[in-house]
Swiss-Prot record:
Its cofactor is Zn(2+). A motif ('HIGH' region) lies at residues 31-41. The lineage of its organism: Bacteria, Bacillati, Cyanobacteriota, Cyanophyceae, Acaryochloridales. InterPro entries: Cys-tRNA-ligase (IPR015803), Cys-tRNA-synt_Ia_DALR (IPR015273), Cys-tRNA/MSH_ligase (IPR024909), Rossmann-like_a/b/a_fold (IPR014729), tRNA-synt_1_cat_dom (IPR032678), tRNAsynth_Ia_anticodon-bd (IPR009080). It catalyses: tRNA(Cys) + L-cysteine + ATP = L-cysteinyl-tRNA(Cys) + AMP + diphosphate. This is Cysteine--tRNA ligase. The keyword Cytoplasm applies. It comes from the Bacteria. It comes from Thermosynechococcus vestitus (strain NIES-2133 / IAM M-273 / BP-1). It is found in: Cytoplasm.
Length: 486
């Protein structure tokens, strides 16, 4: 079965094919850079990173563009509060974004356009909307006239009347008086005297000011890809109004579809409530990592739910993800413990687990099912590793084990799950097997006596000497050596 993706526009699964046979274009709405990224952002950008990696695995060349919204009411407010310029605030949080995404092993985008870099394109697009009667000037602002776009609401599946009901309470009284329709939205905002200390407004034919949020993405998509992009993606909270408004702006000018596929990821929830900065229930990526959580465990947590489904964030889920990564990481390090013969890449492609993995991914990137395939391989390899290291010899031929391991590494990389090469430069004197067994026996005795301080001390002592312990459910302890740095 070819790759099928759920298209928000058609509200159904569709077989994916790009405009150009071997090249896929993707535009992902990026962050508004006024604060640090939280787990909801990790959820979005891990999802689109996996989409990109899987398309590459299928043989496509992928051009992935993700913007930064670096001018916005929230950024201006933060700059004013801090006594800084808008550019200073934006630059700080853009740098933090790159650090967070690198920690999560998210591939860099092909390009990261900033809204402030495309002001001429934005002005041209607004002028095109004015010329065609889709926009009007009011008090120095420019608004999009939604009533002029007959298919407004097609992405969210709602009529104007329904959308108006949802808009109640979101419109400032002064702004409402300038609008012809309550759902008309700002394409350009006139400069205000109180904002001059944090940014310099741009000149436009209708007056000095700055762009609205929605027009920025329309301009950046058009600059990067022309009229139509293969895939446009973002969080479900962007379906309306942001993506609905993007469609209205772009298609009114080009008369062509803005995107062939619209993909939206589900929310991260805390006690079933959406995690967001506005609700104050968010946890930043860097706070989680500062607590000692392995970035790959966080990535694994995100992947345990298919991207469109909600992901509930709990301490128990974090603990389970950390344990899962320990299992997977042990298998990924197998080559450091067991000599594996080389294999041909075709053997990975023809592996039954590769077929099962692709079946899961072809069903709208079902990472939960794909992970189940990966963990089956990991557990099989860990059993083989324990047998080999503890005198049991090979349970299967080295070639079979090597094929499994190379398949595991390849499939895990498609999900962006990659283990760093473990090393221990502190390892100076190698313990003998007998010394290791004696220390493990002493630790076991301490655990049975509930002397956990001594148990932990012995575990740490062994780890400092390059010996990693893996406690089993039956009470036994397996061990393996962590190679020292070359």
């Amino acid at each position: 079965m070819p790759l099928h993706l759920y298209n928000t526009l058609s509200r159904r699964l569709e077989p994916f094919s790009p405009l150009h046979p071997e090249r896929v274009t993707i535009y992902a709405c990026g962050v508004t850079v006024y604060d640090y990224c939280h787990l909801g952002h990790a959820r979005s950008y891990v999802a689109w990173d996996v989409l990109r990696r899987y398309l590459t695995f299928l043989g496509y060349t992928v051009h992935y563009v993700q913007n930064f919204t670096d001018i916005d009411d929230k950024i201006l407010r933060r700059a004013y509060e801090n006594g800084e310029t808008m550019a200073t605030v934006s630059d700080r949080y853009i740098a933090a974004y790159h650090q967070d995404m690198a920690a999560l092993n998210i591939l860099p985008a092909s390009a990261y356009p900033r809204a402030t870099e495309v002001i001429p394109e934005i002005i041209n697009l607004i002028q095109g909307l004015l010329d065609r009667g889709y926009a009007y000037v009011a008090g120095g602002d420019v608004y999009y006239a939604v009533a002029q776009f007959p298919s407004y609401g097609k992405l969210s599946g709602r009529q104007l009347e329904q959308l108006m009901a949802g808009a109640s309470g979101r419109i400032e009284e002064e702004e409402e008086q300038r609008k012809r329709h309550p759902l008309d939205f700002a394409l350009w905002k006139a400069a205000k005297p109180e904002e001059m200390s944090v940014y310099h407004p741009w000149e436009a034919p209708w007056g000095k000011g700055r762009p609205g949020w929605h027009i920025e993405c329309s301009a950046m998509v058009r600059q990067a890809f022309g009229a139509t992009v293969d895939i446009h993606c973002g969080g479900m909270d962007l379906i309306f109004p942001h993506h609905e408004n993007e469609i209205a702006q772009s298609e009114a000018v080009t008369q062509q579809p803005l995107a062939r596929f619209w993909l939206h990821n589900g929310f991260v929830t805390v006690n079933t409530e959406k995690m967001s900065k506005s609700l104050g229930n968010f946890t930043t990526i860097r706070d989680l990592l500062a607590q000692g959580l392995d970035p790959m465990a966080l990535r694994l947590l995100v992947l345990q739910a298919q991207y469109r489904k909600p992901l509930d964030f709990t301490p128990e889920a974090l603990t389970a993800a950390a344990k899962g990564w320990q299992t997977l990481g042990e298998a990924l390090h197998l080559h450091q413990q067991i000599p594996l013969p080389p294999i041909d890449a075709a053997e990975v492609r023809s592996h039954p687990k590769t077929e099962a993995f692709c079946q899961a991914m072809d069903e709208d990137l079902n990472t939960a099912a794909a992970l189940a395939v990966i963990f089956e391989l990991a557990k099989t390899l860990n059993r083989e590793q324990h047998r080999y290291l503890h005198g049991g010899g090979w349970g299967r031929s080295p070639a079979e084990v090597s094929r499994d391991w190379h398949t595991l590494v390849t499939l895990a990389q498609v999900l962006g799950l990659e283990a760093k090469e473990e090393s221990n430069p502190a390892l100076t004197v190698e313990l003998t097997d007998e010394e290791i067994q004696a220390l493990i026996a002493a630790r076991t005795a301490a655990r049975q006596a509930k002397n956990y301080t001594e148990s932990d001390r012995l575990r740490d002592l062994l780890l400092a000497q390059g010996v990693k312990l893996v406690d089993q459910k039956d009470g036994t302890t397996h061990w393996f050596r962590v190679p020292s740095a070359p």
